[in-house]
Amino acid sequence: MGDKEGACFMKIAKYLDKALEYLSILALVIMISLVFFNSVLRYFFDSGIAFSEEFSRICFVYMISFGIILVAKDKAHLTVDIIIPALPEQYRKIVLIVANICVLIAMIFIAYGALQLMSLTYTQQMPATGISSSFLYLAAVISAVSYFFIVMFSMIKDYKESSDK
């Protein structure tokens, strides 16, 4: 990939990052607003917004899904690394490669399972919103596939950097 393609790819990645950040914030704001206003309406008027619980759940699921992608991109997930820093450099690389391969396998299982759940619930609609139930499982597919590619590209980048040394 040349400099021009690399710069174009980085620009697209930057826009996608910003879009995911804004979508996550939007989902959080909508979720909090719906829950708050629904609680106020139920407390004062003994009736609430019919679709607020379902739509809040959708917002929560997608907010988490987008957050998974954003955190994976920055390698900012919580990790327990008591043993890894104590290992010699050559073993540390092997352990990290094995861990990344395990993550890739897990993402394949998650994406496959979520696709199966999507196909099973495709015809079911949520009662208040009428949105297909499979829409919730789409978030798992999106985050698992995105996480898979982020880890894969990270492994390729790490390999290229280590082979350049």
UniProtKB/Swiss-Prot annotation:
Question: What GO MF terms are annotated?
Answer: transmembrane transporter activity
Q: Which InterPro entries match?
A: DctQ, TRAP_DctQ
Q: Which residues cross the membrane?
A: 20-40, 51-71, 94-114, 136-156
The record's GO CC annotations read:
plasma membrane
Which subcellular locations apply to this protein?
A: Cell inner membrane
What pairs make up the disulfide bonds? none
User: What is the membrane topology listed in the Swiss-Prot or TrEMBL record?
Assistant: Multi-pass membrane protein
> Chief location of this protein?
membrane
Q: Which GO terms describe its biological process?
A: C4-dicarboxylate transport
Keywords attached to this entry? Cell inner membrane, Cell membrane, Membrane, Transmembrane, Transmembrane helix, Transport
- Taxonomy, superkingdom: Bacteria
Regarding protein family, the annotation reads: Belongs to the TRAP transporter small permease family.
Its name, as the record gives it, is: Putative TRAP transporter small permease protein HI_0051
Supply the source organism's classification. Answer: Bacteria, Pseudomonadati, Pseudomonadota, Gammaproteobacteria, Pasteurellales
